[in-house]
């Protein structure tokens, strides 16, 4: 009798185990896809007089256009459309990451939207890799989530499976090509949609974009172009004050050469330039007295050059020397030598 009781208990346990294994949930069969998952969270209504919680701040209405934000998952998710074995059962769509189920809905209550995009005007319009899904919850609120497939053909196979599962009861919306959608590629961060899936970028890419957006506009510089430096700079006030021991006419000439030098135009030369070329040759020793004797001769009958031209050229050369730093250094050395000899200008 004990053996019979033990055998009956074994039969009871085995029947219970069979009933658990044959539950409707385990008999479901369906297709699976590896997708990227994102959920849309609407901004809750708030009291304008209430202060935000500590560490948070309110977002202005003009900043967020759709009063909500998309939050994508950081790792791939598993999308599955389950087909129960019972004829009266309804297919179920499930999205899970690992062992955690984030979405589980009847396919018949879901609304699917499939945007159509194109790369360029020459390419035909094709389906996107992103599918938007929406439904109405028990609080009469619209809930939305989105999935991104690796290839457009995967999205097409998923929608075909959904269409076969729900038959005529489901709602399928194919969004035509418009301004809200742009071409997508293999990069997960380049698909942009006004109310679509936005992917988070790391801080390094954000900093890199800010650096490229803010550029410094500078005029192009030629390879042989030099910096703006004046060859003949006006004499400083310190150099003029150092020459205070010289006659007043000489100091007046030093002051005027820095002001009038840029305003004066070169005097037109005569028909013959031989004498002027000879004057340029004699400027190596800064022999001003020799040039004064040459200019004081008046009209040179042999060459036919006017004495006024020579005088003007002599003054131009003197002004050039006055603007030369080496000549100013020579004047300072001469001034020191005269001071050492007793300061007698007659020497």
Curated annotation (Swiss-Prot):
Which keywords does this chain's UniProt record carry? Cytoplasm, Meiosis
Q: One cellular component GO annotation, for this chain's record?
A: cytoplasm
**What are its GO biological-process terms?**
homologous chromosome pairing at meiosis
Taking the record's annotation, the residue ranges forming a coiled coil are none
Keyword Cytoplasm among record annotations: yes
A Pfam family reported for this protein in Swiss-Prot or TrEMBL: PH_PHS1
Question: What happens biologically when this protein's gene is inactivated, per the record?
Answer: Male and female sterility. During meiosis, synapsis is uncoupled from recombination and pairing in the mutant gametes.
Q: Is Nucleotidyltransferase included in the keywords of this UniProt record?
A: no
Quote the subcellular location field of this record.
Cytoplasm
Main localization of the protein described in the UniProt heading: cytoplasm
Q: What is this protein for, i.e. what is its function?
A: Required for accurate chromosome segregation in meiosis. Required for pairing to occur between homologous chromosomes. Acts in early recombination steps and ensures pairing fidelity and proper repair of meiotic DNA double-strand-breaks. Regulates recombination and pairing of homologous chromosomes during meiotic prophase by controlling transport of RAD50 from cytoplasm to the nucleus. May affect pairing of the gene-rich fraction of the genome rather than preventing pairing between repetitive DNA elements.
Q: What is this protein called?
A: Protein POOR HOMOLOGOUS SYNAPSIS 1
Species of provenance: Zea mays
The gene it comes from is PHS1
């Amino acid at each position: 009798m004990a053996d019979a009781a033990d055998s009956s208990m074994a039969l009871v346990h085995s029947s219970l185990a069979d009933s658990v294994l044959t539950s409707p949930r385990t008999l479901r069969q369906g297709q699976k896809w590896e997708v990227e998952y994102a959920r849309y969270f609407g901004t809750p209504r708030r009291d304008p007089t209430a202060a935000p919680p500590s560490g948070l701040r309110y977002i202005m209405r003009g900043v967020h256009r759709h009063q909500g934000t998309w939050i994508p998952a950081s790792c791939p998710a598993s999308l599955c459309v389950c087909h129960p074995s019972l004829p009266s059962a309804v297919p179920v769509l499930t999205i899970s990451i690992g062992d955690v189920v984030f979405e589980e809905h009847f396919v018949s209550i879901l609304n699917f939207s499939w945007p159509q995009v194109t790369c360029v005007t020459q390419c035909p319009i094709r389906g996107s890799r992103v599918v938007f899904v929406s439904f109405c919850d028990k609080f009469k609120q619209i809930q939305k989530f989105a999935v991104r497939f690796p290839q457009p053909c995967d999205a097409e196979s998923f929608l075909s499976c959904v269409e076969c599962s729900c038959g005529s009861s489901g709602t399928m919306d194919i969004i035509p090509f418009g301004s809200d959608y742009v071409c997508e590629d293999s990069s997960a961060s380049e698909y942009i949609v006004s109310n679509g899936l936005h992917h988070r970028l790391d801080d390094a890419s954000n900093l890199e974009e800010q650096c490229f957006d803010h550029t410094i506009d500078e005029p192009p510089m030629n390879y042989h172009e030099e910096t703006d430096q004046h060859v003949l700079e006006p004499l400083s006030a310190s150099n003029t004050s150092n020459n205070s021991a010289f006659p007043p006419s000489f100091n007046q000439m030093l002051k005027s050469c820095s002001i009038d030098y840029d305003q004066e135009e070169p005097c037109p030369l005569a028909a013959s330039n031989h004498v002027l070329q000879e004057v340029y040759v004699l400027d190596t020793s800064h022999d001003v007295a020799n040039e004064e004797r040459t200019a004081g001769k008046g009209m040179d009958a042999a060459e036919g050059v006017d004495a006024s031209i020579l005088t003007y050229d002599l003054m131009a050369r003197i002004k050039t020397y006055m603007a030369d730093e080496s000549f100013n250094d020579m004047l300072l050395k001469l001034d020191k030598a005269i001071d050492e000899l007793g300061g007698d200008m007659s020497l």
